[in-house]
């Protein structure tokens, strides 16, 4: 919100978002710039994480197919910037996973009823970034990993609340309330994952926590 509505002054700018713990090269930035020139109708340009671990191939494939956005390193195009300003869309305060919602908004062109549109989020093959992979092999890392799983659970619940709001109230993403807490009234038991015991435990715990939060 701050970047879009306060910091960016030139509407023709390509807005590059980078996490502080990422490593990128000049070639990656050039690739994003070239990608912007070649994909003038795109909203988001997605970079690709350097191959680490067993999920790298899947992430790369989904990114290049316009189905995934890594929040570590990506670019908001001038077209998306202008559309955000025109619609007045803002990320709700307290949201976990800003990049996930931005990708959702871009793919659906600001309305859930539009469905996913191809070409609005584009993976850029030459835009690579390095990152630190958290491995739970020490007590400190285990604690950090556990906190990360809790955040993933909250993100999952929040995204389901957003979808419920858009389905029941107003399918325009720009109509989302200013604070994510206002969306918790749309939380339902079926939002709790049942694919494995750990996710069920985490989501049940998260569900109980948000029920104690008042708007």
What are the residue ranges of the model-derived segments?
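Short beta-strand-to-loop acidic/aromatic patch adjacent to the donor-nucleotide binding site
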Residues: 11-23
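Conserved nucleotide-sugar donor-binding
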Residues: 69-88, 99, 104, 108
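A short, conserved alpha-helix in the catalytic core of glycosyltransferases
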Residues: 93-118
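Short beta-strand-to-loop element that shapes/binds the nucleotide-sugar donor at the catalytic cleft/hinge
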Residues: 23, 45-59
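Conserved donor-nucleotide/metal-binding helix-loop-beta segment in metal-dependent transferases, i.e.
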Residues: 27-44
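Active-site nucleotide-sugar/metal-binding loop of Leloir-type enzymes
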Residues: 2-14
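Terminal low-complexity segments of carbohydrate-biosynthetic enzymes
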Residues: 135-215
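Active-site donor/metal-binding and catalytic loop motifs
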Residues: 116-148
């Amino acid at each position: 919100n701050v970047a879009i509505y306060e910091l960016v002054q030139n509407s023709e700018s390509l807005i590059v978002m980078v996490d502080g713990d990422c490593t990128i090269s000049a070639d990656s930035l050039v690739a994003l710039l070239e990608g912007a020139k070649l994909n003038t109708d795109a909203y988001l340009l997605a970079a690709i994480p350097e191959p680490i671990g067993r999920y790298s191939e899947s992430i790369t494939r989904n990114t290049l197919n316009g189905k995934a956005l890594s929040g570590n390193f990506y670019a908001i195009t001038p077209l998306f910037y202008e559309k955000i300003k025109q619609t007045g869309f803002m990320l709700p305060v307290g949201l976990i996973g800003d990049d996930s919602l931005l990708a959702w908004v871009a793919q659906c062109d600001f309305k859930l009823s539009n469905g996913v549109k191809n070409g609005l989020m584009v993976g850029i093959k030459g835009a690579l970034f390095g990152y630190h992979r958290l491995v739970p092999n020490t007590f400190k890392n285990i604690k950090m990993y556990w906190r990360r799983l809790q955040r993933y659970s909250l993100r999952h619940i929040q995204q389901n609340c957003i979808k419920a709001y858009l389905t029941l109230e107003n399918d325009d993403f720009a109509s989302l309330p200013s604070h994510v807490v206002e969306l918790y009234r749309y939380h339902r038991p079926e939002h709790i994952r049942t694919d494995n015991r750990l996710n069920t435990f985490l989501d049940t715990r998260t569900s109980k926590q948000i029920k104690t939060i008042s708007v």
